Amino acid sequence: MAAGTLYTYPENWRAFKAQIAAQYSGARLKIASAPPAFTFGQTNRSPAFLGNFPLGKVPAYQGDDGFCLFESNAIAHYLSNDVLRGSTPQASAQVLQWVSFADSEVIPPASAWVFPTLGIMQFNKQATEQAKEEVKRVLAVLNQHLNTRTFLVGERISLADITVVCSLLWLYKQVLEPAFRQPYPNVTRWFVTCVNQPQFKTVLGEVKLCEKMAQFDAKKFAEMQPKKEAPIKKEKGGKEGGKQQPQQQEKKEKKKEEKKAAPAEEEMDECEAALASEPKAKDPFAHLPKSSFVMDEFKRKYSNEDTMTVALPYFWDHFDREGFSIWYAEYRFPEELTMAFMSCNLITGMFQRLDKLRKNAFASVILFGANNDSCISGIWVFRGQDLAFPLSDDWQIDYESYTWRKLDVDSEECKTMVKEYFAWEGEFKHVGKPFNQGKIFK
């Protein structure tokens, strides 16, 4: 039976998966989430920790026998028993299916909707409304599946239930008020059944369902942002004033440091977004000359204003042909695509693995067709004149599964493709299948 230590920060929902799995399997698990055993931002930056867990991320697991694991799903899987993992090849595959579903379909919209209500992310109305629609779609899929089932896989709780429940936890606690969750009674019945099991309650405590949808709090968001240091004012006056200035400045700096520390603690405790504080790596695009095209400004136009009348004209008016390039990508293996939601997993999974590329890229990737008859293609905008993926080993996992063709930005073909893919509407003559759904990388 597994025995070891789980390193995490308090209230990390990703760590809950491993903790609940251990409750079911009987694995002996020590939790290191507070000093002196673990201090987030210090312990996970130490040479000893990085020697076992090179990314410095938590949760991280170290067995009493020295066996080490990172990534929450891998840890939860290791700490599970055969019943949780699926006792047949079919059941095991279904468990993996729902674990992937949670990562690619639940977490992105849940984060986009919930994080602003916690004050750790700026509110964007269009992004929030889109996230709500995606959450509705996810809940509808679950509701239909659970219509004739008690649990997601088989007749007993599995790692599928544990993972999806933990992914939905903040939604149910923060924003899924009674009116919103009313159309999905099967999901709520299943969720409540799970969180009231002794093994769940030991880890989660009493889970209170949301009564009123939490909203973005601008004041709370402002309080959680790092404070900008005020410029030092020069003292006027005699020698006595000059002597006092260094002491006064030292006190001010200490106070500023204390104020800065508080938001980081709150953010760390509330959400996995604290993991954003990773060591800065060298910018892969540092060798390129500065461009006049401000990608972030275009993304704001695209997110907040009409695509056809505002965002697209802005794009072409400001696009830097020397500093950026436009590419058409097409998935190489359409014959392997089956269920639509699983095909979308390929897109969202790729987006997640390219997270650090977002500052220098934009893409609209679309799934066309229906179940067992679909294809994937998209338009990508990259900093520079070459594909960005070779610039970092972290970006090379998925791109070889696509064919890439650089477009002539002055051609009618390019303008038509950009228009259709950015707007998610048009004839898409080169595809030959109807639009199913799209994903935006920004």
Curated annotation (Swiss-Prot):
Q: Please give the CDD domains that the UniProt record associates with this protein.
A: GST_C_EF1Bgamma_like, GST_N_EF1Bgamma
Residue ranges annotated for the EF-1-gamma C-terminal domain, each copy included: 281-442
User: Residues in domain GST N-terminal?
Assistant: 2-87
Q: Which SUPFAM superfamilies match?
A: eEF1-gamma domain (SSF89942), GST C-terminal domain-like (SSF47616), Thioredoxin-like (SSF52833)
Keyword line = Elongation factor, Protein biosynthesis
Q: Which residues form the GST C-terminal domain?
A: 88-216
Q: Where is this region: Disordered?
A: 227-273
- Compositionally skewed regions (Basic and acidic residues) per UniProt: 227-242, 249-263
| Molecular function per GO | translation elongation factor activity
Where would one find coiled-coil regions in this protein? none
Q: Name one GO biological process term.
A: translational elongation
A Pfam family for this UniProt protein?
A: GST_N
Q: Which GO terms describe its cellular component?
A: cytoplasm; nucleus
Q: How does it assemble?
A: EF-1 is composed of four subunits: alpha, beta, delta, and gamma.
State the protein's purpose: Probably plays a role in anchoring the complex to other cellular components.
Q: Which PANTHER family match?
A: ELONGATION FACTOR 1-GAMMA
The identity of this protein, by name, is: Elongation factor 1-gamma
Q: Which organism is it from?
A: Danio rerio
